[in-house]
């Protein structure tokens, strides 16, 4: 791409993310933007064949190759760790490996419930957006995001910033609302005056779980944030 390439790289990465999001969505999966050139997809219910199709279709459209590691675990964190391990076993990003679909011999697709928490900050527009400069809010949001990532990781969950003042956490099916309350308490002590609420959705795939979580969050908002946590099966 030459020396004047940074803007081209950003455009390419954005287009690849959009492509992958649409492809995984079409199979009821969801892609989270992690470090731009590394993405995490929740692909429960998606077959090996369809993972391969996504890789092949991407390479027909873009001047890059892509590799995927598929992990399975008792918790989202354990699944992600396994996905990284099976991919690393095929060669690092600096090796001669160009593309691979790696998994550990599990029966795929994985069929089972997915649990998602949609978290946001109460009255964020009034207490932050309308008062402070954007960049100050951006810094504080990232500090809060780091706290949530670290605390959700402790219970085996993955947490991602989802724009605005919204965070999506892919949670273990065993997670109890009391664990979420503990995470909120820790967050609110560190990031005053912010208070959190969350809708929790459980579905047969991640899109269904997110949809149910969104419905719960909407109901909490309509109740003027009197409830902190609501769950919908």
Predicted features and spans:
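Regulatory and interdomain segments flanking nucleotide-handling catalytic cores
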Residues: 1-233
């Amino acid at each position: 791409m030459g020396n004047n390439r940074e803007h081209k790289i950003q455009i390419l990465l954005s287009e690849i993310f959009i492509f992958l999001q649409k492809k995984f969505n079409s199979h009821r999966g969801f892609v989270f933007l992690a470090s731009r050139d590394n993405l995490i997809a929740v692909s429960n219910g998606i077959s090996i064949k369809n993972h391969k199709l996504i890789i092949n279709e991407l390479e027909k459209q873009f001047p890059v190759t892509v590799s995927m590691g598929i992990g399975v675990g008792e918790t989202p964190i354990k699944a992600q760790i396994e996905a990284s391990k099976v991919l690393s076993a095929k060669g690092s990003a600096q090796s001669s490996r160009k593309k691979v679909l790696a998994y550990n011999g599990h029966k795929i697709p994985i069929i089972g419930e997915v649990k998602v928490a949609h978290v946001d900050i109460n009255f964020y527009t009034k207490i932050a957006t309308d008062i402070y400069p954007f960049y100050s809010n951006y810094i504080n949001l990232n500090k809060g995001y780091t706290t949530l990532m670290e605390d959700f990781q402790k219970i085996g969950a993955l947490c991602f910033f989802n724009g605005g003042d919204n965070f999506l956490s892919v949670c273990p099916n065993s997670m109890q609302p009391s664990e979420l309350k503990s995470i909120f308490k820790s967050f609110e002590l560190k990031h005053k005056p912010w208070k959190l609420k969350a809708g929790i959705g459980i579905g047969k795939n991640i899109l269904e779980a997110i949809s149910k979580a969104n419905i719960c969050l909407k109901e909490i908002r309509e109740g003027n944030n009197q409830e902190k946590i609501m769950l919908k099966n």
